[in-house]
Amino acid sequence: MGKVRPTFVKRPAREIVEKYEEYLTTDFEHNKKVVEIVARPKTKKLRNMIAGYVTHLMRLKERQREEGTE
């Protein structure tokens, strides 16, 4: 089973994906830099948690696109 992420991670991550989807990828390191620029989280840990969830959401979107084309 995976981790349960709190609302203070999910909400900003969803907003970032909604507004800046064209700048995001499935690469955590790249998303970490985007989150740092866009959201300015207070701590590194929070930045990484948000970037991790953003990466998760982007992978889900990619899978949905692939399944939709088959």
Curated annotation (Swiss-Prot):
Coiled coil: none annotated. Gene3D superfamilies: Ribosomal protein S17e-like. GO terms for cellular component: cytosol; ribonucleoprotein complex; ribosome. It holds the Pfam family Ribosomal_S17e. It comes from the Archaea. GO terms for biological process: translation. GO terms for molecular function: structural constituent of ribosome. Keywords: Ribonucleoprotein, Ribosomal protein. PROSITE patterns: RIBOSOMAL_S17E. Belongs to the eukaryotic ribosomal protein eS17 family. This is Small ribosomal subunit protein eS17.
